[in-house]
């Protein structure tokens, strides 16, 4: 599967290339083509299985996604269900603050180091990756904790 830049269909990348490169050469984001996924099959699955199936679907050249999901999330969130859906009166609230820094960004930033490591393996890359952040909010802390 190839990802395309949001600014040009002619700029493409595999999942591993997109993860390592970050942005497309034209400054656009890499997006995947819309492909069918059996959403009904995910309805009664636990969070780890859902994450594994969705990420495997979107990133087919990354192997052992189940192991990456386990390493990213197991034991790092307050609840087994990473982002529990909690009834509040006649409505539901998705709790996105159960991660290590209590920021919604923990969901993505705990997975990012696993994906970077897997992408390096796919590309046969041995160089270290330098992550530089600057923030006035919770993003930097969430990124730092994700990489610890």
Per-region residue spans from a language model:
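PLP-dependent amino-acid enzyme catalytic core
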Residues: 1-148
């Amino acid at each position: 599967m190839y990802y395309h830049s949001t600014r040009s269909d002619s700029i493409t990348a595999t999942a591993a290339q997109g993860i390592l490169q970050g942005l497309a050469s034209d400054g656009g984001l890499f997006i995947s083509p819309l492909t069918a996924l059996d959403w009904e099959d995910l309805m009664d699955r636990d969070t780890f299985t859902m994450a594994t199936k969705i990420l495997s679907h979107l990133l087919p050249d990354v192997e052992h996604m189940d192991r990456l999901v386990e390493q990213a999330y197991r034991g790092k969130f307050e609840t087994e269900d990473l982002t529990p859906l909690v009834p509040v009166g006649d409505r539901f609230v998705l709790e996105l603050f159960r991660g290590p820094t209590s920021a919604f960004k923990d969901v993505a930033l705990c997975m990012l180091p696993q994906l970077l490591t897997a992408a390096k393996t796919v590309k046969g890359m041995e160089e270290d990756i330098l992550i530089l952040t600057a923030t006035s909010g919770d993003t930097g802390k969430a990124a730092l904790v994700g990489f610890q």
